[in-house]
Amino acid sequence: MAKLEAQQKDDLQEKLIAVNRVSKVVKGGRIFSFTALTVVGDGNGKIGYGYGKAREVPAAIQKAMEKARRNMVTVELNAGTLHHPVKGRHTGSRVYMQPASQGTGIIAGGAMRAVLEVAGVHNVLSKAYGSTNPINIVRATVDALVHMKSPSQIAAKRGLNVDEIRG
């Protein structure tokens, strides 16, 4: 079992996005703990994010990584970029991403960049609107990527060929 877990861990890229110290106020004072936000991906369209909380930083990061590995989704990519422009939203955060030509790179900020890198997107133009809270940006980015449809998915839904869809 441990060998299988280690092997699974090796082929995934892991990125730590944020670590915060949070406190709980009790009668005797404050109790400090730490939260960690992480993303993992295989660089080929599989991504997951996790949020962990513990009394120590390493434990919070480990919990977040485990949650990210458990909650992975698959995204259809088009040769290192997106199929079409997409929008995603989560609470007060909105993100917009559009495909870019070869050599453009990842034009994205902070948390969105980390998600796109581990997903395997190499060329994309993106913008975050509203709240730039890293948790909400990550969730909005994953939401946008999940709702992106490839031409083959659209053709299958309409009962047509891909050539008929593209015109």
UniProtKB/Swiss-Prot annotation:
GO CC entries: small ribosomal subunit
GO MF annotations, alphabetized: rRNA binding; structural constituent of ribosome
Gene3D superfamilies given in the database record: 3.30.160.20, 3.30.230.10
InterPro entries from the UniProt entry: Ribosomal_Su5_D2-typ_SF (IPR020568), Ribosomal_uS5 (IPR000851), Ribosomal_uS5_bac-type (IPR005712), Ribosomal_uS5_C (IPR005324), Ribosomal_uS5_N (IPR013810), Ribosomal_uS5_N_CS (IPR018192), Ribsml_uS5_D2-typ_fold_subgr (IPR014721)
Occurrences of domain S5 DRBM (ranges): 12-75
Biological process, per Gene Ontology: translation
Secretion signal, residue range per the UniProt entry: none
Keyword line: Ribonucleoprotein, Ribosomal protein, RNA-binding, rRNA-binding
Subunit structure: Part of the 30S ribosomal subunit. Contacts proteins S4 and S8.
Annotated PANTHER family: MITOCHONDRIAL RIBOSOMAL PROTEIN S5 (PTHR48277:SF1)
Described function: With S4 and S12 plays an important role in translational accuracy. Located at the back of the 30S subunit body where it stabilizes the conformation of the head with respect to the body.
Family: Belongs to the universal ribosomal protein uS5 family.
Recorded domain comment: The N-terminal domain interacts with the head of the 30S subunit; the C-terminal domain interacts with the body and contacts protein S4. The interaction surface between S4 and S5 is involved in control of translational fidelity.
Annotated protein name in UniProt: Small ribosomal subunit protein uS5
Organism: Shewanella sp. (strain W3-18-1)
Name of the gene encoding the protein in the UniProt record: rpsE
